[in-house]
Amino acid sequence: MTSAQICIMIAIIVYLIGMIYIGFRCSKKNNSTDDFYLGGRKLGPFVTAMSAEASDMSSWLLMGLPGVAYLTGISDAGWTAIGLAVGTYINWLIVAKRIRRYTHTCNNSITIPSFFSNRYRDEKKMLQVIAAIFIVIFFIPYTASGFAACGKLFSSLFGVNYLTAMIISAIVIVAYTTLGGFLAASTTDFIQSIIMSVALIVVLIFGVETAGGIGAVIHNASKLPGYLSMTLSYDVNTGKAAPYSALTIVSTAAWGLGYFGMPHILLRFMAIEDEKKLKLSRRVATIWVVISLFVAVFIGVIGYTMSKVGALEMLTGSNSETIIVKISALLSQHGVIFALLAGVILAGILASTMSTSDSQLLAASSAVSSDILGAFRKDSSNKNGSMAAARITLLVISVVAAFIARNPNSSVFAIVSFAWAGFGAAFGPVVLFSLFWKRTNKWGALAGMVCGGSMVFIWKYLIRPLGGIWNIYELLPAFLIACVAIVIVSLLTPKPSKKIEEEFDRVAQMK
């Protein structure tokens, strides 16, 4: 092992030990499942903002997004980033405060499925169980992609066996999440967002300098047809510019719709201690997201120029997702300090993965232990039993995710894209209508959830392959169909009870 690799290893080990320590400290504050899954609703504004965005921006921020920009230019990555930035702001603006109030009013709901059940007085728990099933369906492979990303990182850096690296990474994530629950996940996510920011800044500065300056970056990138255009895309196969139609732009920007249905992000809104500070959280979150997304896309362009001038090898296919890893390896060759900085960058990649994986594990765990098992558990007063069930469920889900992640060849961006569409379509419309349309009833919510979730599969595997006008991101049509289903079914079935309507009015009138 070289001195540079040793420095990188030291930085990463210090980071990992810190995460486990936080989990241990937070474990002492968990006295109930409310604490374990929602931190007792005690998050401050900065932790709420940064943990929400860190859990949102998974490894694709430092791997997938720069990789797409490196290969095809700024159009695909750019419109995705714009959709996400707009979606982030709107989610904080219209959903955050209302869902914080409503979940607290609705029998102190601590999960999204339990909120649906309490919101519509669903005594048979149909909404709760079906929502929980969708969470497990989409989150287990999503978590597996995070484990796989960690394994790939260590394997490529140190030449260790992929499976060994993946399992060790999974153990660390599971350790602090199982110990500390939501509070540990949120605290570590806050720290991880800072590390991710440092990683982006260092790579940006070093990359521009190595590429020969901003002018050289723009000059080299502009030589590729359509590479720097928002209405064209560079086609790797033909070497020519390909049209980026208005339909494709709308389809790509539709990523922003996914935010309304992301359980691990919505939980942060539910957990803030003082709803009056959500405005501050919104500003912090939006600024961080806009800057991070812009820098991530630009790093992809910088990486191409670095390859063009011979500083890096030319990357093809999924290897383009390792562009920041390659830049870090180059940085580490400039001495001990730079090697430690490279370690921080790589810890940032690790952080981007871990910050999402821990939140996903908690959401999937709560879906099984609290929403599925809890729906059939008669005695809910046994706090120790509930906590034990929560931790055991988290461990079982982690083992399943690790089993799926044993294959190192899966695409991080593709898995994230599909899971994002699944949650956005299954839950997004139901969340919005539950919060803002009084006439919505449980049958409409159920129809929207089932239609949205199932249409993601139907569109992706049966309709989208037809090409042409059908080749759009599955989230957009599935989201719209779910909205239509909610309205039609709600209007065709009895309206909500007077008690439900009065509760809706009470929440809506809160100042």
What are these regions (language model features)?
Residues 1-511:
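Membrane-embedded helix-loop-helix hairpins and adjacent transmembrane boundary segments
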